[in-house]
Amino acid sequence: MDTIAAISTPMGEGAIAIVRMSGPEALAIADKVYKGPRGKRLSSVDSHTINYGHIVDPETEKVVEEVMVSVLKAPKTFTREDIVEINCHGGLVTVNQVLQLVLREGARLAEPGEFTKRAFLNGRIDLSQAEAVMDLIRAKTDRAMNVAMNQMEGRLSSLIKRLRAEILETLAHVEVNIDYPEYDDVEEMTHKMLIEKATKVKKEIEALLTTSEQGKILREGISTVIIGRPNVGKSSLLNSLVHETKAIVTDIPGTTRDVIEEYVNVRGVPLRLVDTAGIRETEDIVERIGVERSRQVLKEADLILLVLNYSESLSDEDIKLFEATKGMDIIVIVNKTDLEQKLDLDRVRELAGNQPVVTTSLLKEEGIDELEEAIQSLFFTGAIESGDLTYVSNTRHISLLHEAKRAITDALEGIENDVPIDMVQIDLTRCWEVLGEIIGDAVHESLIDQLFSQFCLGK
């Protein structure tokens, strides 16, 4: 492989920016541009050390930057190749000059995710662990981070590898029974034993799939839409959950004329929170566009926060909102309880049915804890708090687990219906192969390229 380089820190002004190199020539290229105290060369220093010096243009001998350089020698590195990380002062100009120097001296600009891709190709991590790296970067809550970290450390991989080993052992027994039935010392694989082994695998796959709904929520967030008539407190609710002013809060109906989106961490549950324009009939063209967008995001939401005004009677528009959200997960929020009551709460609870109704005074910051509790209990039963964080959150993994379940189910049905054993072998083999795709065994190169292209440069 050639030697790659990229800036591995976010672009912009900051304390430190890092240019990362990985590959067989990383140390040689670094030696060309690095000038250390008393002529020290990076290729001769100990591995896993950080070294003070300067980056110098070898053509002009001009000092470009004062740096600290980390040297990590193969194979005990993330990519299992030699890695050099040049720690520069933050800023766009100097870090780009350093990058251009190492590229000129023989490195190639890395593609997005190429460092992690090399870790996968060199056997440092499997595909599910590589995908977990991106999940860790994108985690919006502590829970999401813990799930990604467990997957990155190989928890899911170990489980998948164990299942595959059990299937392979079963296949080997079946093969021996078919090819060498005359040997007395070969354990006979009876139908009962086959059913027991296949059922065990199926149950473990199903157990993983039961975590997928919560896992996807932790990974992708709950698409949550705040709806209600204008000036009932939707923007105040958004700001209370986000803890900063994102939307304009005024007494003028129709102030929010567009869709405002923000990620919110509610007790470890990531909400992709959308504040919509008030849904009402209006002659204002700009507001009407916002109302239409509100109706569209409403259709795509996982959770609806329907806000009502405690100080106003239930209107036809409120009732229409209840009708529009029938069959959806909603939490009804009765706001402005600091004002005189005019809302019929019994009627509201009747319209809400089994859905939670929470009373709040966002002005006085009352009722927020109850709302957060309602959100958490609606999506999580408490199992998420346990130490077992082997959650399946990746859509690709979930799809493959469903396919593996179908294959093992077909194998079980075949055994129970006395189909020829070689047909059962086909289904067992298919299950084994599909599970292997989760960790990267027998995955098409185009899929690998597509997965790693989603990473940022320098990772």
From Swiss-Prot:
GO terms for molecular function: GTP binding; GTPase activity; metal ion binding. The gene is mnmE. GO terms for cellular component: cytosol. NCBIfam families: mnmE_trmE_thdF, PRK05291.1-3, small_GTP. Its cofactor is K(+). Binds 1 potassium ion per subunit. K(+) binds at N231, T250, I252, T255. Keywords: Cytoplasm, GTP-binding, Hydrolase, Magnesium, Metal-binding, Nucleotide-binding, Potassium, tRNA processing. Belongs to the TRAFAC class TrmE-Era-EngA-EngB-Septin-like GTPase superfamily. TrmE GTPase family. Residues 221-380 form the TrmE-type G domain. One of its GO terms (biological process) is tRNA wobble uridine modification. (6S)-5-formyl-5,6,7,8-tetrahydrofolate binds at R20, E85, R124, K459. It is found in: Cytoplasm. Coiled coil: none annotated. It is an enzyme of class 3 (hydrolase). GTP binds at residues 231-236, 250-256, 275-278. The keyword Iron does not apply. It comes from the Bacteria. Exhibits a very high intrinsic GTPase hydrolysis rate. Involved in the addition of a carboxymethylaminomethyl (cmnm) group at the wobble position (U34) of certain tRNAs, forming tRNA-cmnm(5)s(2)U34. It holds the Pfam family MMR_HSR1. The keyword Cytoplasm applies. Mg(2+) binds at S235, T256. PANTHER family: TRNA MODIFICATION GTPASE GTPBP3, TRNA MODIFICATION GTPASE GTPBP3, MITOCHONDRIAL. Its EC number is 3.6.-.-. This is tRNA modification GTPase MnmE.
